[in-house]
Amino acid sequence: MLDATREALAELGWGGLTMGHVASRAGVAKTTLYRRWPSKNELVVDAVASIFDELVMPDLGSLRADIEAVVGQFADLLARPETQAALLALFAEGTRDPQLRRRIREAIVDPQKRLVRQGRAAAQARGELEADTDTASACEEVDIIFDTIAGTVEHRVLVSGEPITPAWTRRFIDLLLGPLIVG
């Protein structure tokens, strides 16, 4: 059902997407959809959130290698036409609907911050980053790092239409890590 939702969204756009279209494409009754998702917004958010489940933070032995791997995974994900259509539609609709924006944050953004937390913890354990001194600052830094990486990659792919090349990734990581790396 989630695949059918993303396919229908890519084909029809937000305005054209209905629970009926998704049910027909998925081969289920509309009541089946409504039992699990009370609205189109909920269904689309879950469909988009499931795309990001495949992102993982590897432990490749260095923060640089870990970030390169995640940026590559994220760029590959964003290169898919269905992902582009789904994200752009969801973000556009979220600008008009504060509840949808909150749901996007809860179901998509906040769960993906786990990648930053995992990468930071591994880098701290390896001595690449200083240990956190207080929880509030650490949480704020996770937010800033996530926003910087996700925002930059999304903007480059979805807004500028530019590819994420290995050379671009290396330069981006140089700029990102320069002030962070311990001594």
Task: Specify the residue positions occupied by each region the protein language model found.
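Amphipathic alpha-helical segments used for helix-helix packing
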Residues: A47-V48, A79-R105
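Hydrophobic/aromatic-rich alpha-helical bundle segments in the mid-to-C-terminal region
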Residues: R102, E106, D110, Q124-L175, ...
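Solvent-exposed, amphipathic alpha-helical segments
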Residues: A4-L12, D66, V70-Q73, A86-E93, ...
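Hydrophobic alpha-helical connector segments
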Residues: L55-Q84, A138
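Amphipathic alpha-helical interaction segments
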Residues: E42, A65, A69, A85-A89, ...
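Residues in soluble alpha-helical coiled-coils and helical-bundle/repeat scaffolds
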Residues: P38-E42, L78-A79, T95-Q99, P163
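Helix-turn-helix
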Residues: A4-E42, D46
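Hydrophobic/aromatic residues within well-ordered alpha-helical segments
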Residues: K40, A47, E82, I108-Q112, ...
